[in-house]
Amino acid sequence: MRGFRFPLLLLFCCGLLFTLSSAPVAAQSSKVKLDSTDGFEIVNGKAGMATYRGQKAVHLMPLAGHELTDGSVFAILKGTDFKDGAIEVDLAGAPRPGADPSMKGFIGIAFRVQSHAEVSEMFYLRPSNGRAPEQLTRNHSAQYVSDPDFTWQRLRTETPGKYESYVDLEPGVWTKIRIEVAGAKARLYVNGASQPCLIVNDLKRGESRGQVALWSHETTEAYFANLKIE
């Protein structure tokens, strides 16, 4: 039996080495320093730096003449290649002065962005709905969409209530969101909650990949800070 000790020890060590080498490696966290707009591709708008409620932030704005029109502004983070993982950001959105009452301060994060924002998955918030006096309006506070085919109108018509939900929000107030993505599933967390406010188990583009982008509506005063990608 003494002659088997070394082979057994060698076998054990080899097995341990294989186990460690084949174990999944934890995703590394990457904090994006938002002290300049140089690292973004801006689509359908413009971006600048501002100090908002004590935080240095990226300020997304519509192009001149589009301040009250119905369109999207994207700030695509150059060099990102996101498939699975997590995205965190602090954001603050409120309707621009003079905006129609139906405009709710739409603001959010797009992921797996392709073709200069023609294609994307997205979670966004409607801050003005968060404390509305009617429950049905509150239930439209958080939204998932998938451009270009699955707009909020289509999703609400075909599957009412499945891709939007209530979450407590205030317009113009810093709000932390976290998006966790795995395969064709994604979850949205707000303000450090341990449970998601919105769960999507069938992302419309399946297991795709692409860039990460800040997003706002043209009628929104939109600010972003403390972006982190894991």
Predicted regions and their residues:
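N-terminal secretory signal peptides that target proteins for export/translocation
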Residues: 1-6
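Bacterial N-terminal signal peptides
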Residues: 7-21
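Extracellular glycan-recognition regions
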Residues: 26-230
